């Protein structure tokens, strides 16, 4: 659980006052399978510029269905036109081509092939993509809804994307890029090994080449834009990913805080680039884990020097940002026992008595929405300041040691 490092935290149970306040404020929700009815419960967030939808795990069907239902409603009734998810940019670009440009539906194994495959290669995401393709079909291009990845992990795929783009419009530029990216070639399939190599030999650093390549693409943007703006933007983002990924893997062995902050800063910068590229009036929905879309400054993460995309969005957009977390008590989850291991369906341990999830369970609501923004429920907001644990299940889940792992 992400808050297990709360300074001085001793096991405690949520106060009766907090449980009563939650029970009074909570609005019962229908099942997310009732898409229209469920989505309509989130009308209040339609005026936001950025709506961030979280999840307490990376493998719960209900979270994906709930986000899809909310997003559909925000698209249909409030003009949201960018979907940005905690996924690799090149894979999400394949989905974007499918939903906007009538490309063939990606085959199983063509996209989201990197561990953890189940995080985005699942029925719920496919059903949403099919719906989005149908929604976009009658619209002119500038009014269509786009689908993008925010993450930093696609070093190899992004290098190939930049080279493929330059091969088509600037062969000389492609030669320069191959030379600059050549330093990273030995590490493309196992980029974490690049960080280990740099740790022991600073001469292995590839920073100068990737920075020079990004600068080169920016300097030639007017020439490249004459061919196709969307293709140029895609290539530019891939060059930015190569730059960020090189640094991410280079510093990952120096400490988790620096690498975490770099990753979430890149996610925020990517979101900002998307907002700028789509132009005035752009409204975005972000799908990511609670640990990314929550306000890190209000949690143990912030106390240890970490920030996240949610905190950065809150700073940038203020009241025009809505951060919506998702919690769970019991059930099952798709997860692995170790990084790179096979997916398993695991039983989720009941929420600890000293957790927010346990407090919500005690309200008696199976599903509910609780909104305490803008001082509308000051008593509840004050009660929620009491330090409790918050569940955060990632792609690796070991139920027997959930808090410590």
Model-identified regions with their sequence ranges:
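Structured catalytic-domain cores with a bias toward divalent-metal coordination
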Residues: 2-405
């Amino acid at each position: 659980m992400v808050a297990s490092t709360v300074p001085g935290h001793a096991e405690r149970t949520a106060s009766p006052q907090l449980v009563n306040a939650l029970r009074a404020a909570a609005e019962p929700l229908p099942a997310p399978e009732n898409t229209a009815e469920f989505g309509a419960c989130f009308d209040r967030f339609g005026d936001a510029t950025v709506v961030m939808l979280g999840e307490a795990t990376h493998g719960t069907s209900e979270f994906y269905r709930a986000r899809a239902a909310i997003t559909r409603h925000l698209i249909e009734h409030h003009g949201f036109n960018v979907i940005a998810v905690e996924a690799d940019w090149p894979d999400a670009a394949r989905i974007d081509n499918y939903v906007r440009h009538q490309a063939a539906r990606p085959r199983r194994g063509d996209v989201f092939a990197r561990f953890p495959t189940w995080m985005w290669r699942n029925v719920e995401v496919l059903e949403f993509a099919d719906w989005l393709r149908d929604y976009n079909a009658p619209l002119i291009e500038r009014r269509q809804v786009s689908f993008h990845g925010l993450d930093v992990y696609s070093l190899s795929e992004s290098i190939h994307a930049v080279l493929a783009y330059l091969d088509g419009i600037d062969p000389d530029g492609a030669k320069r890029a191959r030379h600059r990216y050549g330093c990273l070639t030995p590490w493309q399939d196992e980029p974490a090994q690049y960080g280990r190599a740099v740790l022991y030999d600073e001469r292995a650093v590839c920073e100068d080449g990737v920075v020079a390549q990004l600068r080169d693409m920016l300097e030639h943007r007017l020439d490249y834009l004459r061919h196709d703006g969307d293709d140029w933007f895609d290539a530019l983002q891939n060059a930015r990913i190569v730059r960020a990924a090189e640094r991410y893997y280079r510093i990952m062995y120096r400490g988790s805080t620096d690498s975490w902050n770099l990753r979430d800063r890149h996610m925020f910068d990517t979101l900002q680039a998307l907002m700028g590229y789509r132009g005035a009036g752009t409204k975005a929905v972000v799908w990511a884990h609670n640990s990314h879309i929550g306000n890190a400054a209000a949690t143990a993460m912030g106390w240890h020097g970490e920030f996240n995309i949610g905190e950065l969005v809150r700073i940038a957009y203020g009241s025009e940002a809505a951060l919506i977390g998702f919690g769970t008590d019991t059930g099952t989850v798709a997860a692995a026992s170790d990084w790179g291991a096979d997916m398993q369906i695991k039983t989720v341990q009941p929420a600890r008595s000293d957790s927010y999830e346990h407090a919500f369970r005690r309200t008696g609501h199976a599903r509910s929405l609780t909104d305490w923004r803008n001082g509308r429920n000051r008593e509840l907001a004050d009660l929620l300041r009491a330090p409790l644990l918050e569940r955060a299940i990632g792609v690796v889940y070991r139920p027997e040691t959930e808090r410590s792992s």
